[in-house]
Amino acid sequence: MNNNFSSMIDRYKHQQLQIGSVSPQQISAWATKILPNGEIVGEVKKPYTFLYKTNKPEKEGLFCERIFGPIKSGICACGNYRVIGDEKEEQKFCEQCGVEFVDSRIRRYRMGCIKLACPVTHVWYLKRLPSYIANILDKPLKELEGLVYCDFSFARPITNKPTFLRLRGLLKYEIQSWKSSIPLFFTTQGFDTFRNREISTGAGAIREQLADLDLRILLENSLLEWKDLGEEENTGNEWEDRKAGRRKGFLVRRMELVKHFIRTNIEPKWMVLCLLPVLPPELRPIIQIDGGKLMSSDINELYRRVIYRNNTLTDLLTTSRSTPGELVMCQEKLVQEAVDTLLDNGIRGQPMRDGHNKVYKSFSDIIEGKEGRFRETLLGKRVDYSGRSVIVVGPSLSLHQCGLPREIAIELFQPFVIRDLIKQHLASNIGVAKSKIREKEPIIWEILQDVMQGHPVLLNRAPTLHRLGIQAFQPVLVEGRVICLHPLVCKGFNADFDGDQMAVHVPLSLEAQAEARLLMFSHMNLLSPAIGDPISVPTQDMLIGLYVLTSEKHRGICTNRYTNCNIRTLQTKSSDYSNSKYKNPYNNGPFFCNSYDAIGAYRQKRINLESPLWLRWRLDRRVITSRETPIEVHYESRGTYFEIYGHFLIVRSLKKKILFIYLRTTVGHISLYREIEEAIQGFSRAWSSDT
C-alpha cells in the first residue's frame, strides 16, 4: 500500500515478502500498465468507486477495471465475453472500454497509484520512535514536524546568484519597502517561481535535505565524532556527562541506520513519497448486503479523502494563478494529514472518525496486532501436517526433545507410516494400511518410532515475536494428550505451564528438515539473538524446584547443639566406620557412607528432602587445610577424637591422622551436586572426543 511494500515472488518455488523502502520508479512499475493499444493506465485520478445507476466501477476511480482488471473473469465493462487462455482469440482486450479479458483474480494483486501534487513524508519514518528522518538529518523532531506541516519555512537559495532573501541578508540596514513587498509575492501570479527560488517548506524541504546527503561521508563523520566523545574524560558535571552519553547513543543509532541504507541500496529521499500506491481492490472490498446496502472498507474512504485533497491542490497550482500562497501551503498541509491518516490513523493525536463516531481503520491498523493481516490471516491459518495442544513440563526430556502425544503423532506422520507399511509388505495398499492404523496394532507404534527417529518437528507459540518463537525438536512419543516441553526452552517461547498452547508442524521437504536441524534446533539457540545473553536459563518452575531442593532445616551444627545428631552415633558395635550405612538411634541425625545410601533412604521415606544428615566425604584438601577452629572436640576411650565444625566433622586417630570426614548436608543438596557432576563429566567426555 505504501512505499514500504516490496513483494518478491518466485512462481516456481518460493514465496516471500520483504518490507522496506522502494523508489518511486518501482512504485510506478507496480502500478502502470501499457494496454495493447498503447494507452498507459494505472493512475487513480478520481475519488469515486461505483456508478450509482449501473453499479459499475467508475473509470479512473478506486475500482476501475482498466487499472485493476475485470470484476468477472473474461467479461469487460461493456459486457463482452472472451474465453481466457484461448489462443484462437486474437483480441485480448476490449477496444471500447479498454478492459483486458483476463482472470478476475488479478484484482487481488494488481496495484494502482496516486500522483501526489506535492511531496509527502511517510509518517512511519517521521513520527514513529525513533524517528528515522530526525536521526539521519540530526535535527529535532519538533523542528521537522513544523517544516512538514507548513508551520514555518526556511530560506534556501539554490543558485549562486543574489536572491531576494540572500541580498536582504547582506545589507546592514533595513529597507522598509521590502517589508511591504514580501507579502505581495504570496498573492501574485509569480508566487510559484518565488517559492521555488527563495524558500522551501513542507515535505519537499525534507526531501531536498535527504537527497543532498552522502551516506558514506555521513557515516565517517559520525564515527569520528563518536570516537572524539569516547576519548573525552569526565568533566565532573553530571549534566554534561549525561549529555555526552546521550549524544554517543544517538550517533550509534545513526550509524546503524546509515549502514542499513548502504547495505540495502536504499536512498534516504525515498522516505518522502511522490507516488502513493493504491492497494488492489480485493484487499479493500465493497460488499453488498441485504437490502441493497453497501459495506465498504475504511481504506476506501481514506483513499477518497487523499484524492479529493490532492485534486484540489492540483487545481490550485495549475488553474488558479492568483491563488494566495498561504492557501496553497494550507492545502499541502491537508494533503499531508490525509496521507498520514491513511497510513496510520491517530499517530498525530486525535484519530479521524466517521459519521457514527467510529475510528477509521488505517493501513497500520489492518496489518498490526493480533487481528492484523500478518498474525491472524497469514500466520494464524490452519495448515496441513500440523496440530495443537496444551504444553506441560517434561523433566525427563533432553533439551532438544519434546514429548508428542500418540494421537497427534500418528496423524502427523500417517503418510510416512503408510509408506513404511507398504514398503515392508505389512500392508498391500493404502486402504489396508489406514485400517491397521485405525485399529492401532502394535506394529504401528514400532514403525512410528522409526519414522520419528530422524524427523524433527517445529513447535510454535503465538505470538511469534522473534526468531526463537519457532524452534525445532526431536519428537518422543508420550502418553496422554498434551505436548511435553523441556522447561529451559520456555523463555525463548515466552511460555509457562499454566494452560499455554503450542502448535506443532512437520517439515516435509529435505530442505526444510535440513534447515530445522542446522538452524532451528533448540540446543543450538542458547543465546538471545537480540543482546547475546543466555536465554536457556532456569525460570519459574525450575527456580522454585531449585529453591525447594536446596532448602534446609537447621543444617548448621550450631543450630541444634548436637541434639539431632549426637556424635556418639558414630560409636556402634563395630569400630569399622567404612561399613556403617545407616546408624541413627535418634530421629534427625543419620550418618551415611555415600550418596547412594542417602538417596535410597529418602526413597524409602526414612528421611525427608530437607532433613540434615552426615555424609562421609573424601579427604578434601580444602577441609584439611581449613583454618576454622572446631566448635567442640570429643575424645573417646580408644584414643580417637572428633573435631566438630560448623558444617563438617573430622574423625582423627590417636596419632592425629584423619580417618574420615563427614559433611553436614541434605538429600536435596546431594541430588543437585550429582546432577552437576554428571553434566560436567558428560561435557568433558564430549570435549575430549572432539579434540
From Swiss-Prot:
<dbReference type="GO" id="GO:0003899">
    <property type="term" value="F:DNA-directed RNA polymerase activity"/>
</dbReference>
<dbReference type="GO" id="GO:0009536">
    <property type="term" value="C:plastid"/>
</dbReference>
<feature type="binding site">
    <location>
        <position position="94"/>
    </location>
    <ligand>
        <name>Zn(2+)</name>
    </ligand>
</feature>
<dbReference type="InterPro" id="IPR045867">
    <property type="entry name" value="DNA-dir_RpoC_beta_prime"/>
</dbReference>
<dbReference type="GO" id="GO:0000287">
    <property type="term" value="F:magnesium ion binding"/>
</dbReference>
<dbReference type="InterPro" id="IPR042102">
    <property type="entry name" value="RNA_pol_Rpb1_3_sf"/>
</dbReference>
<dbReference type="InterPro" id="IPR034678">
    <property type="entry name" value="RNApol_RpoC1"/>
</dbReference>
<comment type="similarity">
    <text>Belongs to the RNA polymerase beta' chain family. RpoC1 subfamily.</text>
</comment>
<keyword id="KW-0804">Transcription</keyword>
<dbReference type="InterPro" id="IPR006592">
    <property type="entry name" value="RNA_pol_N"/>
</dbReference>
<protein>
    <recommendedName>
        <fullName>DNA-directed RNA polymerase subunit beta'</fullName>
        <ecNumber>2.7.7.6</ecNumber>
    </recommendedName>
</protein>
<feature type="binding site">
    <location>
        <position position="496"/>
    </location>
    <ligand>
        <name>Mg(2+)</name>
    </ligand>
</feature>
<feature type="binding site">
    <location>
        <position position="500"/>
    </location>
    <ligand>
        <name>Mg(2+)</name>
    </ligand>
</feature>
<dbReference type="GO" id="GO:0003677">
    <property type="term" value="F:DNA binding"/>
</dbReference>
<dbReference type="Pfam" id="PF00623">
    <property type="entry name" value="RNA_pol_Rpb1_2"/>
</dbReference>
<dbReference type="Pfam" id="PF04983">
    <property type="entry name" value="RNA_pol_Rpb1_3"/>
</dbReference>
<keyword id="KW-0240">DNA-directed RNA polymerase</keyword>
<dbReference type="InterPro" id="IPR044893">
    <property type="entry name" value="RNA_pol_Rpb1_clamp_domain"/>
</dbReference>
<dbReference type="InterPro" id="IPR007066">
    <property type="entry name" value="RNA_pol_Rpb1_3"/>
</dbReference>
<dbReference type="GO" id="GO:0005739">
    <property type="term" value="C:mitochondrion"/>
</dbReference>
<dbReference type="InterPro" id="IPR000722">
    <property type="entry name" value="RNA_pol_asu"/>
</dbReference>
<comment type="function">
    <text>DNA-dependent RNA polymerase catalyzes the transcription of DNA into RNA using the four ribonucleoside triphosphates as substrates.</text>
</comment>
<dbReference type="GO" id="GO:0008270">
    <property type="term" value="F:zinc ion binding"/>
</dbReference>
<keyword id="KW-0862">Zinc</keyword>
<feature type="binding site">
    <location>
        <position position="97"/>
    </location>
    <ligand>
        <name>Zn(2+)</name>
    </ligand>
</feature>
<dbReference type="GO" id="GO:0006351">
    <property type="term" value="P:DNA-templated transcription"/>
</dbReference>
<dbReference type="Pfam" id="PF04997">
    <property type="entry name" value="RNA_pol_Rpb1_1"/>
</dbReference>
<dbReference type="GO" id="GO:0000428">
    <property type="term" value="C:DNA-directed RNA polymerase complex"/>
</dbReference>
<feature type="binding site">
    <location>
        <position position="78"/>
    </location>
    <ligand>
        <name>Zn(2+)</name>
    </ligand>
</feature>
<keyword id="KW-0808">Transferase</keyword>
<keyword id="KW-0460">Magnesium</keyword>
<keyword id="KW-0548">Nucleotidyltransferase</keyword>
<feature type="binding site">
    <location>
        <position position="76"/>
    </location>
    <ligand>
        <name>Zn(2+)</name>
    </ligand>
</feature>
<dbReference type="InterPro" id="IPR007080">
    <property type="entry name" value="RNA_pol_Rpb1_1"/>
</dbReference>
<feature type="binding site">
    <location>
        <position position="498"/>
    </location>
    <ligand>
        <name>Mg(2+)</name>
    </ligand>
</feature>
<keyword id="KW-0479">Metal-binding</keyword>
<keyword id="KW-0934">Plastid</keyword>
